[in-house]
Amino acid sequence: MRKKDDVLEIGVLNLMHDKEDTKRRFERVLTREDCRVNLTWFYPVMHYQDREVPENVRQMSQPLDLNKVKELDAFIVTGAPLEKLDFDDVTYISELQELFDCLSTEGIEQLYVCWGAMVAANYFYGVDKYLLNQKLFGVYSQVILENYPLLEGLSDGFLAPHARYAELSCSQVREVPE
């Protein structure tokens, strides 16, 4: 990542259905006075391959372009309400996989949120997701196991909202060598 006095260029692939609200929430967290950040918002092109891109999506984001991604310092892939689908049934899965390869090859810092984390864990490490018997919904304590610059200012733990129908296999996550 860049030095503190430089602007940090972060790309965000916004996969959520409530794009405006998701954008507002990420901007509130990532654009602080003590950290100069420029956010570039993207949408998956393949998601709109058979239909027109909605006006609100066009106004707030641009088509995912790996050449533009290569110029960024970091990249975030948001969640999406797709956890009930098999990964291969997602219309833009190959586009995501190309993005994952690009980010890794270019050495770009990555953050995956919710379903974005599930699909990345599956792609990079073969970790499976499984459906829960009922939706997990609520605010739960999180523990920080390792310090990282992105987590500066947080205590040893924090509360985070959860709303999902699937989880990753904990035993497979524990087997990941990294």
Question: Each predicted region: which residue ranges?
Answer:
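Beta-sheet entry/capping signal
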Residues: E9, A74, I108-Q110, F158-A160
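N-terminal beta1-alpha1 cap of cysteine-dependent amidohydrolase-like domains
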Residues: M1-D88
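A structural signal for short, well-ordered beta-strand segments and their strand-loop junctions
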Residues: T40-W41, Q110-C114, H162
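Pocket-forming structural segment of enzyme catalytic cores
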Residues: Y123-E178
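Short, solvent-exposed loop/turn segments at secondary-structure junctions
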Residues: H17, H47, A80-E83, A117-V119, ...
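Short, flexible, glycine/charge-rich loop motifs used to bind or transfer phosphoryl groups or to couple energy/partner
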Residues: M1, P63-N67, D101, P149-L151, ...
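Cysteine-nucleophile active-site neighborhood
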Residues: V77-L145
